[in-house]
Amino acid sequence: FNEHRFNIVLACRQSGKSISACAYLLWFALFHSEKTIAILANKGATAREMLSRITLMLENIPFFLQPGCKALNKGSIEFSNNSRILAAATSGSSIRGLSVSLLYLDEFAFVERAAEFYTSTYPVISSGKDTKVIVTSTANGIGNQFHKIWEGAVQGVNEFKSFRVDWWDVPGRDEDWKKQTIANTSQLQFDQEFGNTFFGTGDTLINAETLLGFRAQPYTETLESGDLKVYNKPIDKHDYIMTVDVSKGRGQDYSTFT
């Protein structure tokens, strides 16, 4: 996180992503003076729970590292070096008017109206040249703001640095654990919760695993500055039919044309 300003982490369930982020936030506050750190989660209670974890860490670090605290409550911690950590739910007004040095967005794929929130928050982020952003989440459908940022980071079209934590990266998880987990749930649930796989939000006639197995043929050329891909040239005097599946406009899925 130190080497990159914008960071996004796709991690499987129960991989320690939140607690690891809490440790980094505490370190950042202790060793950087006059910084404002904001923890925003899909629910205010979740953000406050993360702040309580930071408080517990603070109580258990070596005494010579423990800073003085000017204020400590359920919603914020203010240190003697004038750095502070705030916790709140993700809303358009969460950090409006604040000069934020480090913004942490937890389980961002589960935030309702995430695109609207991100649009209103980005000016606060971009106003500071050194403002850091850390976004973490498990996969939760296709087309939401987290999915868009992640895909952009992987493809190298935005400023985010992508990090991925898979189930086999977690100590104690092996093939036997995988088989037992699938037996207790399902392959689809395992892929979503532990496989870092993005599935559509609704049930489909053909299951998502089969659809994801298909691969498009290579396109032959691009038009419209690369936004339009051409796979085959139209054949003269042939009739063509287009089927359209429109999205509901909730930022959860794409409109598709076949």
What is each of the regions a protein language model found here?
Residues Q14, A109-E112, K248:
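Catalytic acidic motif of RecA-like/P-loop NTPases
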Residues H4-L25:
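Walker A/P-loop
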Residues D236-D239, V244-T258:
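Metal-dependent catalytic core segments for phosphate chemistry
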Residues K35-L56:
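Conserved Walker A/P-loop ATP-binding site and its immediately adjacent core
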Residues L56-N60, L65, L102, F110-T185:
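ASCE P-loop NTPase helicase motor core
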Residues E49-S101:
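Inter-Walker segment of RecA-like/P-loop motor cores
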